[in-house]
From Swiss-Prot:
This protein's encoding gene: MT-CYB
Required co-factors: heme b
Organism of derivation: Deltamys kempi (Kemp's grass mouse)
Binding-site positions, heme b b562: H83, H182
Task performed by this protein: Component of the ubiquinol-cytochrome c reductase complex (complex III or cytochrome b-c1 complex) that is part of the mitochondrial respiratory chain. The b-c1 complex mediates electron transfer from ubiquinol to cytochrome c. Contributes to the generation of a proton gradient across the mitochondrial membrane that is then used for ATP synthesis.
Protein name listed in UniProt: Cytochrome b
Transmembrane segments: 33-53, 77-98, 113-133, 178-198, 226-246, 288-308, 320-340, 347-367
GO cellular component annotations of the record: mitochondrial inner membrane; respiratory chain complex III
Residues reported to bind a ubiquinone: H201
Length: 379
């Protein structure tokens, strides 16, 4: 008798990707975050779909439609808070996933890595346009400030900003198009995820030792499906605790006030997961320089395969670069903290030092430590 999953054209693809996939036998829990990101994407698309059924993308009714979802729709409050906090869980998993990729040298699989960077940028764009939709004070002013940064682009800047706004300020046209973008982008992300997996399965997974694992592989199912289910259970539990006990802990109090173009909040800041990039943007006094630094703070990830001079794969046997890596992570946490602080001394100075450190570690210090370690091996 033929096994259906091995012969059916559609099931065969699923089988080769998730069931009989040869997987290194030693991959740790840090490799769980790929499946957790998939789970987050499914949660966001499903909760988002139900929210879109009740939301109205009009400046006059957007804020009250979100209030209506929370008050009058069956379990609307839960769907809304799962969606809002699901975004935070999504970004926590994303940052850990990227961090694991840097630590274990997964960037040598350059196609997978580059698609991952595109995925990160697309997810950030989706979260940004989504944050505008409730049409609270921080939604409105966040949209105004961030889109206005494009005006720093020479020659076409002002035209580009007005084109994105659909007028001379953030208004009804902006909200409507942002809703359209927020609806379509998750499906683009899903397509990119499939490409990401396609490239990953071309080369096979990396593993903690950084050594070739072709001689020691096991099927993905049941070993890693069970392991992933544990991760998914823990993720769902954390998300439910957040959504049920602390639903607004990661939000901004200003967003409980309807958008008012005549009243600027004291401190305009984005969601917590953008604060590191926002701190880098604010640390440069020049507008265009700040925008370039903001974009480069993410695009610099693409330089990892190019700047990698190490003869070893990953950081597991490289104590010098390991120490630098953890300094880099600590520096990112400092940037995140600074992004949420007011623009005044000493925060501006700390932000500038942390921003310089961020770029210096990636471009100069890590390649130098790689070379030092290569020379130590020769001794």
């Amino acid at each position: 008798m033929k096994i259906l999953r091995k012969t059916h054209p559609l099931l065969k693809i699923v089988n080769h990707s998730f069931i009989d996939l040869p997987t290194p036998s030693n991959i740790s829990s840090w490799w769980n975050f790929g499946s957790l990101l998939g789970m987050c994407l499914v949660i966001q698309i499903l909760t988002g779909l139900f929210l879109a059924m009740h939301y109205t993308s009009d400046t006059a009714t957007a804020f009250s439609s979100v209030a209506h979802i929370c008050r009058d729709v069956n379990y609307g409050w839960l769907i809304r808070y799962l969606h809002a906090n699901g975004a935070s869980m999504f970004f926590i998993c994303l940052f850990i996933h990227v961090g694991r990729g840097i630590y274990y040298g997964s960037y040598v699989l350059s196609e997978t890595w580059n698609i991952g960077i595109i995925l990160l940028l697309t997810t950030m764009a989706t979260a940004f346009v989504g944050y505008v939709l409730p049409w609270g004070q921080m939604s409105f002013w966040g949209a105004t400030v961030i889109t206005n940064l494009l005006s720093a682009i020479p020659y076409i800047g002002n035209t580009l900003v007005e084109w994105i706004w659909g007028g001379f300020s953030v208004d009804k046209a902006t909200l409507t198009r942002f809703f359209a973008f927020h609806f379509i982008l998750p499906f683009i992300i899903t397509a990119l995820v499939l490409v990401h997996l396609l490239f990953l399965h071309e080369t096979g997974s990396n593993n903690p030792s950084g050594l070739n694992s072709d001689s020691d592989k096991i099927p993905f199912h049941p070993y890693y499906t069970i392991k992933d289910l544990l991760g998914i259970f823990l993720l769902l539990m954390t998300l439910m605790i957040l959504a049920l006990f602390f639903p607004d802990i990661l939000g901004d109090p200003d967003n409980f006030t309807p958008a008012n173009p005549l009243n600027t909040p004291a401190h305009i800041k984005p969601e917590w997961y953008f604060l590191f990039a926002y701190a880098i943007l604010r640390s440069i006094p020049n507008k265009l320089g700040g925008v370039l630094a903001l974009v480069l703070s993410i695009l610099i990830l693409a330089t990892f395969p190019l700047l990698n001079t190490s003869k070893q794969h990953g950081l597991i046997f490289r104590p010098i670069t390991q120490t630098i890596y953890w300094i880099f992570i600590a520096n990112l946490l400092v940037l995140t903290w600074i992004g949420g602080q007011p623009v005044e001394y000493p925060f501006t100075t700390i932000g500038q030092i942390a921003s310089i450190t961020y770029f210096t570690i990636i471009v100069i210090i890590m390649p130098v430590s790689n070379t030092i370690e290569n020379n130590i091996i020769k001794l």
